[in-house]
């Protein structure tokens, strides 16, 4: 929240002799005091964010735990082990801490998987990844892997039949690694459907097990919805889309009529299009 500084200038009137009063009135008005600029807010460091997430309030934790299903949709054949990676090189979503707590709680309650958490690039190496069945990118942004060995470690991980999952901003990564962007399915290209707005969603694959929670019905939800660069979006030929924006609802489709989004209309062209929010794909032998 921006701080506003209000400066009040008080003018004092003095009684002057009659012969000087007229002359005084002709004097140029005094200059107003310059407004003092608010002090710039200190930019949070990565350690500041981590400290904030470590102090997630009990009320916030309770609300997350209340929303988590009591059991898995399907019974797992075995307990899996996942590595949750949450580093950011770009915009930092404040919800990362809540996401980490949610995943830890699901792992503990449902016992379908166990979860380890890291923000250290060095942990993305072949030897370490052998311990895991999946990598979850929790709202990571602008990830730039440090070397070819890390990139190859993820490719080998996928070739071994393992899995990668991405939450929200996972689509805002790998701008210097085309194969990584293809693995995710696309790259961020703005969010005309902004945070705080309530948007309609439809089930593109209502019978899929991951959509059972919606009981075959579309829904409205408050969230920030990404769209993806046409040149990087893998499209419906490569992606099995589970949920997308319901463009039949005027509240959703009319957003693109805003003059601010003319560049997007030029990019995507006229007519209906699919804006996915959840999908699956096979990639290099993994999923």
Language model features: what each stretch is:
Residues 70-73, 227-231, 266-268, 272-285:
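Short, surface-exposed beta-strand/loop micro-motifs that present aromatic residues
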Residues 252-271:
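Short, surface-exposed loop/helix-turn segments at secondary-structure junctions
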Residues 167-257:
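An acidic, glycine-rich "communication" segment
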Residues 1-23:
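N-terminal export/membrane-targeting signals
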Residues 82-85, 129-175:
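Short alpha-beta junction capping motif
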Residues 65, 100-104, 151-155, 177, ...:
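Extracytoplasmic/secreted envelope proteins and their assembly/folding machinery
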């Amino acid at each position: 929240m921006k701080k506003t500084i209000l400066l009040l200038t008080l003018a004092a009137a003095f009684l002057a002799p009659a012969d000087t009063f007229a002359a005084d009135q002709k004097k140029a008005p005094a200059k107003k005091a310059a407004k003092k600029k608010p002090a710039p807010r200190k930019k949070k460091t990565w350690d500041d964010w981590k400290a904030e997430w470590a102090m997630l309030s009990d009320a916030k934790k309770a609300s997350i735990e209340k929303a988590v299903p009591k059991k898995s949709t399907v019974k797992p054949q075995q307990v899996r082990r996942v590595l949750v990676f949450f580093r950011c090189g770009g915009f930092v979503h404040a919800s990362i801490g809540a996401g980490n707590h949610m995943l830890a709680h699901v792992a503990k309650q449902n016992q379908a998987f166990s979860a380890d958490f890291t923000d250290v690039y060095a942990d993305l190496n072949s030897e370490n990844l052998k311990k895991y069945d999946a990598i979850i990118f929790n709202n990571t942004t602008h990830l730039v892997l440090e070397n070819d060995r890390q990139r190859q470690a993820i490719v080998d991980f996928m070739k071994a039949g393992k899995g990668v999952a991405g939450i929200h901003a996972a689509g805002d990564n790998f701008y210097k690694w085309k194969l990584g962007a293809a693995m995710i399915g696309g790259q961020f290209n703005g969010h005309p459907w902004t945070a705080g707005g309530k948007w309609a969603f439809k089930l593109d694959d209502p019978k899929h097990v991951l959509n059972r929670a919606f009981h075959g019905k579309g829904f409205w939800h408050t969230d920030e919805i990404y769209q993806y660069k046409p040149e990087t979006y893998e499209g419906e030929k490569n992606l099995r889309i589970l949920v997308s924006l319901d463009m039949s609802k005027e509240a959703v489709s009319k957003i693109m009529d805003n003059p601010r989004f003319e560049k997007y209309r030029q990019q995507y062209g006229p007519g209906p299009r699919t804006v996915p929010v959840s999908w699956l794909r096979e990639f290099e032998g993994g999923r």
